[in-house]
Amino acid sequence: MLSDQAYDPPPEAGERRVHSALVRPRPLTPNRRLSPFHMTPFALPIDYPRIRRVDSFSALVSTPLTDGVNALCWERALAGDYAEVVAALGAGDGEPLMALDAARLRSLSVSAAGRVAIEQMLADWQLLRDHSLDPVLNCIYGYPRDEEAGPVVTDVFSFHADSAPFEASTYLCTYHGPSSEGLRNEEARRRVDLPATRAELLRHYGGADDADFAVYLNEHCYDLHYAPAPGAKPFSFGLGNFWRIATDYPDSPVPPCVHRAPDTQPGDPPRLLLIS
């Protein structure tokens, strides 16, 4: 898990993560002015039953992930100028990620619209904290890529599922910059199940395709990463939308939600991301 003190691969990297209890609703900041990034219309995938819309934070945290539903989306058009917040944060001193807290954000010299954006992000962060979750709010300038991936790339740009040892969900919201992307389970193939990839993994492992090999795949998180099927159409999580997605945990009633960090390019704006 990321902390304010050190940079590790973000939770979107598919690491085995532990989450705590649920969260309760809190009023949002009144609507004022939209950031330019929030002017782009957002549409959930049509006729995809695994995603369910909710209309409040209380519904986001209390609606069960069952009957095939593995993602909840609270669509929101947020007020505030998030681009101004990113500009005020600066270039990040060459680091790929800047951890944000109330003191740092409230010390920024921004307009009233920038202040609205700051208070919105902190309000969302507090919603999660109020329910004993461990959210992190970051300005992300770039993700490190897996330069020595071997047969399976395990960086944040690979489609993957989050994992936990017990029932848990991942909560996330992108406020600025490219947003997270999802992949329909029906269009996802576990990379370890692709014959050529599995054969190469077995060569790296140097043993038989048995229970010990399954442990090897699990320990390296290879079993959490997915390849899009031919013709797959990933979908955007959009900006300002608050998501709750299913993780891979023992006896889960639904498959995990497959997702990834956006494949950012040079010149793309930094991301403001809340995740728990």
Language-model segments: what does each one mean?
Residues 16, 30-132:
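N-terminal auxiliary "cap/dimerization" subdomain that precedes the catalytic jelly-roll/cupin core
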Residues 68-71, 168-171, 240, 270-271:
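Short, surface-exposed beta-edge/turn micro-motifs
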Residues 109-164:
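Extracellular-facing segments of soluble proteins and assemblies that are Gly/Ser/Thr-biased and enriched
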Residues 139-141, 173-176, 184, 247, ...:
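Short, structured patches in soluble enzyme cores that scaffold and shape functional sites
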Residues 153-232, 238:
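Catalytic core of non-heme Fe(II) oxygenases with the double-stranded beta-helix
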Residues 219-276:
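Catalytic core of Fe(II)/2-oxoglutarate
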